[in-house]
């Protein structure tokens, strides 16, 4: 019977075996569904060519691997913030001393992999042939391919001492590395090489260095990024010289916004460049004033970039960030190249891994934890496209590694305690944390709550459409971790709820997901009888005992869009089977990210443990999206029933 409520133990979903997101991913996906974002299907060199043909200038960013695990967490946060500005790609340098090809969280390979898979950034991995045998390089390239990296910057690398000594049987020049990549991997990788506007410091002459650059391009390099320089005329002369010897691939200027006296000296020493005297004259008197130097560096970089862009010779700008963001962001904003409000291709964060290019459907439960979803589905061979399909046994990997640097909270323990409470005295203390997260107001100790275990980011813009309702229910112990308002045919360009191409319309069913007590659930089930034909619900405890009225455990589309010349796209679903995988993660976060802040057996730890053990996870969907959402009334009716005398209520335990 449709909408017949039923309870069960656990649907016994399995976490290993199948490698797709549904029982038969080939049957349930339609790979012919037109892509909402053509760039997802293009190689980097194709994106560049399309931008060059249209005259649409771009920017890109360089980062280096951090030295510590904490630095890795901070760098991933920086990736996420800078991704909002719309870089065409980022690149990650290769540090031989840091075991760059390993699986360490601070290695070049892992940082680049994280940028691609978990931050959705087109990424170039630097690779050097210095002190590496060809078989080692081949191994690194195979690993890069496996991790979803499709772009390599081929470099010779710097010698450990003062003089270059080739590895026995190894390569002596970047040209050799480019040839090796093309021989072993054909056209799989897009290859970038370095250009030196004043010539490489080890080259016999500028002309000799240009000859080597031409050899790298002839061997298969797709584009060039230059070393930093300080005057536009230096770059113009370099491009002219390249053109004269037949180099026709894109040449991107390397831009270094001066951010401090010490960092400038170090970079100049490494690159063996001479700083123009007019720049020295400005910097020397203010060398101890970091703010003044940074402001001057921004002004200088903006002026240089404008001259480059106005020349018509520059398709894009490549920034050496030194893992800092303020100066580069300010330069890009002043140039008008920073995208303040980027158009979302889909309502959730994308991965740039090639095998996920067709993916356009996900369960809503991971909306605020996209990195976790990507991690748990990383072993799938295919991804749902067009519709979620009959998901009778999705193979979600188990999430036990909460310590992984790309899944950890961006806030250190001390900050989390200030936000969530040095000491909890009751369940109501927990309610207050949720309330302050939603309100944005400081807590009783004067600290703002900027994250929760289930959401490490600021509130989504659409939350503002139901902020007062959310505040009201959280004060009552409806601890919301995910929600969306109902939307009926809003333009896809809407700044709050829009997504997808221009000219479309987006729709949403109201959705509410929360933790609450057993007593509240018992009253809620009584109230839901009145809304049986309108509201779908799924209620589960930490042990997996659950009750739902989802018809035949079928997925329910809760977000969809209609766009010119395309089929309906439904990128977000409420899938009852996937919910049972999500509930394990959702409950575990109480302990892993909140409870473990406190000493074992402490009152604060015991309060979190009690909620983990006794509360239920609930999701509600209001199917009547054209009408005002009834979910708030459902909650109000629930508490009205709770406030009656017990003899007036008929209870039904789940």
Swiss-Prot record:
Annotated residues for binding of NAD(+): 62-67, 93-94
Disulfide topology: none
Gene Ontology biological process terms, A to Z: methionine biosynthetic process; tetrahydrofolate interconversion
Cellular component, GO annotation: cytosol
Annotated residues for binding of FAD: 93-94, 126, 156-158, 173-174, 196, 200-203, 209, 216
Annotated region (Disordered), positions in chain: 1-41
GO molecular function, a single term: methylenetetrahydrofolate reductase (NADPH) activity
Residues annotated with Phosphoserine modification: 10, 18-20, 22, 24-25, 28-29, 102, 393
Binding sites annotated in the UniProt record for S-adenosyl-L-methionine: 455, 460-463, 480-484, 559, 572
Pfam family, one: MTHFR
Activity regulation comment: Allosterically regulated by S-adenosylmethionine (SAM).
Substrates-to-products reaction catalysed: (6S)-5-methyl-5,6,7,8-tetrahydrofolate + NADP(+) = (6R)-5,10-methylene-5,6,7,8-tetrahydrofolate + NADPH + H(+)
Cofactor requirements of the protein: FAD
Assigned EC number: 1.5.1.53
Pathway linked to the protein: One-carbon metabolism; tetrahydrofolate interconversion
Residues the record lists as binding substrate: 158, 227, 320, 324
Phosphothreonine PTM positions: 33, 93, 450
PANTHER family: METHYLENETETRAHYDROFOLATE REDUCTASE (PTHR45754), METHYLENETETRAHYDROFOLATE REDUCTASE (NADPH) (PTHR45754:SF3)
Family, as annotated: Belongs to the methylenetetrahydrofolate reductase family.
Role description: Catalyzes the conversion of 5,10-methylenetetrahydrofolate to 5-methyltetrahydrofolate, a cosubstrate for homocysteine remethylation to methionine. Represents a key regulatory connection between the folate and methionine cycles.
Complex and partners: Homodimer.
Name of the protein described by the UniProt record: Methylenetetrahydrofolate reductase (NADPH)
Protein source organism: Mus musculus (Mouse)
